[in-house]
Each structure stands twice: as C-alpha cells, then as structure tokens.
Amino acid sequence: MLRFAPSPTGDMHIGNLRAAIFNYIVAKQQHKPFLIRIEDTDKERNIEGKDQEILEILKLMGISWDKLVYQSRNIDYHREMAEKLLKENKAFYCYASTEFLEREKEKAKNEKRPFRYLDEWAALEKDKHHAPVVRLKAPNHAVSFNDAIKKEVEFEPYELDSFVLLRKDKSPTYNFACACDDLLYEISLIIRGEDHVSNTPKQILIQQALGSNNPIVYAHLPIILDETSGKKMSKRDEVSSVKWLLNQGFLPEAIVNYLITIGNKVPKEVFSLDEAIEWFDLENLSSSPAHFNLKYLKHLNHEHLKLLDDEKLLELILIKDKNLLGLLRLFIEECGTLLELKEKISLFLEPKDIVKTYENEDFKERCLVLFNALKSMDFQAYKDFESFKKEAMRLSQLKGKDFFKPLRILLTGNSHGVELPLIFPYIQSHHQKVLRLKA
C-alpha cells in the first residue's frame, strides 16, 4: 500500500500536492491500494475544515483513494506499541523536566556544540513527580537507507539520540505515530519531501524496534525553490498554496501537469494524469531542487484551457449561452487563466465604464459621439465588419485611431485584443448587451 499523509494545519502546499500525485501514480502503476491518512494528532495546530478542504483538492486533481483514516483514532494503538517497547526494554521513561532540557540546550548553544540528549538524565528529576515522557533507546550503530532519488543516505550514531515517542500527556510524537501507522497499514513505499529526510532514520529505528521485517522504500523529493529569490517556497508564499492557484484560475489538470513536469524527464509537454500513469518513472526525477515558474504554469494552463470541451468550458465560465462558445475560443487564445477569460467575457457583455476608466476628456467625448452613432445603427443589417465600420465612421465623423480605439472599447471593453472582424458576428448577435454604458 502507498499513502499520502497530510496534516490539517493550513492550506495545501504545492510540494505536498506533488508528493500526493506521485504516490497516487505509483500506486496505480503497481496495482496497490492508495491510503489517505489525515495526521491530526496535533490538536493545537489543527484547523477545523482543513481536512475536508484537502480531500476536495485531491478530488479536483483527479486523485482517488481506497482508504481514508484519521491518525488520531489510532492513539490507543500508538500507546500499546509504546508499552510493548517499554516491556522489551527498548524504550524507557524520562522524568527530565522541560526546564532542565531547555537549560541544557542553552548550554550547548553557548558552547557552540549540537544539543544531544543523554540517557543519564532520565531519572534525575524522578523524585519531583514530573509526568514522564517515553523515549526510544538511542542506537549504537549507523542507520542507512537507499533512497530512490537521493541514493544511499546514512546517519551516524552521534546524530541520533534517545528521542521521544510519547509526550507527557501520552500523546504520540509525529515520528512515532507515523512509523506505527506505516507498519499498521503495511506501507511499502513512501514518496515525500526531502524535509522529511531527518525523520526517516527515527522512523526506521521505531519500526525495527517493533520487529518489522519489511523495510519501507523511501523517495525524498527535492524542495521547490521560488523562481525569483531562489529560496525554498514557504507556506507563507501565496503562490505556493494550491488553493490560491485554483482561485487565480489555474485548472487542476494544468497544476497536475506542471507538478509532474518540474524536475522530471517527461515525453511530452501537455498531458493528463492518466497519461502520466503510463510512463512516469521515479528514476527520471532529478535529485536537484526544482524551480517554480509561474509563467510556464500559465503557459500550460493556456494549453489545457484549449483542451476543455464545450460543456466544461461553459460550466467553468458560468455562462449558459452556447452561442458564445466561439467567442470564448477566440478569447482563450489571449488568456492564460480562467480568471483572465472570465474578465474578457465580462467586459464584453457588461456596460462599459468610460467615465471611471479614462481620464482624458477629449477621448471620453469621442467615445460618446461614437456610442450615439452606434446606437442608431441596426447591427444585423450589415453583412460583414467592413460595411459596418464604414457606416459607423460616416455617422460619427471619426477616423483613424480616434475611431478605432473608442470602437474597440465600446464593443469589447478592452483597448486591445482579438481582431474586431473575427468577433463581429458575436457583437451582432449580442449587441443589445454589448453596446451599453455605465451611468
């Protein structure tokens, strides 16, 4: 079984979605079940409703699952596993207070050495009746694993101390809950971000202590860097939020296409998730950081906009008039996102606001002169744009750019865009909506 294990503590990050996509693809390729595990044991950081938001985003991206579990419902199992390790003398109670440990950390910082927990501290404050934590005994050997992307990774004994499994309130730590659940659900491969590399040896040690004979294969994805700063994309960067991208008018299909593409060798530029399942290979992923490029994502989104069928296009733009489909297709050629497309069609159909938009009084006057001329014309009476244009010029007595710029603005709401002869048939059929001015 493969899994994706998000925490409901904030908006889904593009790095998390990328991991979800890759786990889903490999599960499909290997004909294995796919598990979604909501890691909700951190009650203080959980945000109500974020779990459902995550699931909705996954559905939008075309990702389905065979099993959905909430980690918090396995706490009794986690405590049972901790008790097992205590009985087998693989774990121990530690009574050291938070204050004591903070003092030791400060001392290490002042002495410019890494902090390392010492087992001899475990019973120092036992007589003070502190609630104890449970710690796994530190290894006396190196921990190594063969990462599918990073290749051989090794941690020396001095890099791993006796770390906490259960907190004072008997709640499991992230690494303990994660390792226990991966055993419970027989997870065979984990694809996740490289920020988890330091967690991996701890989870391996926990599983070994619990008697696991089926080592998990790990693949740690390189981080995604910001295209301008070159720094790791933070959750605070709005562009790193999947929700933000969707709200900006990026199609789920384009986001999936892009996240599979970056840092990867792909056989074609534009593809679907189902197509990627046919050829995706972890071996083709680069071990170097990927750079997020919003401009290229917009390009891919433009290509996916063109692939939308008529029904889906009308649904997304919230338009029921099928007679506008041809116009939408023309506008798509100039748009990178749904938001841009919606704006173009809205400007076309809504009353034009020349008073608020343009400061030049002479220009506004020309617009009004032309508007009155156009209002007197029967749009349906003209066989083509050329004959319509000549009559409008005659009636308004305007010519050159004094005519064409006001004309485009009055008919489309934009000072530039698709050639007017191409959209004239749609202007004719919708002229009563098109030719309106805001009061």
UniProtKB/Swiss-Prot annotation:
A motif ('KMSKS' region) lies at residues 232-236. Pfam families: Anticodon_2, tRNA-synt_1c. Its main location: cytoplasm. Catalyzes the attachment of glutamate to tRNA(Glu) in a two-step reaction: glutamate is first activated by ATP to form Glu-AMP and then transferred to the acceptor end of tRNA(Glu). Keywords: Aminoacyl-tRNA synthetase, ATP-binding, Cytoplasm, Ligase, Nucleotide-binding, Protein biosynthesis. This is Glutamate--tRNA ligase 2. Belongs to the class-I aminoacyl-tRNA synthetase family. Glutamate--tRNA ligase type 1 subfamily. ATP binds at K235. It is an enzyme of class 6 (ligase). The gene is gltX2. It is found in: Cytoplasm. SUPFAM superfamilies: An anticodon-binding domain of class I aminoacyl-tRNA synthetases, Nucleotidylyl transferase. GO terms for cellular component: cytosol. The keyword Lyase does not apply. It comes from Helicobacter pylori (strain Shi470). It comes from the Bacteria. It catalyses: tRNA(Glu) + L-glutamate + ATP = L-glutamyl-tRNA(Glu) + AMP + diphosphate. GO terms for molecular function: ATP binding; glutamate-tRNA ligase activity; tRNA binding. GO terms for biological process: glutamyl-tRNA aminoacylation. Monomer. Its EC number is 6.1.1.17. A motif ('HIGH' region) lies at residues 6-16.
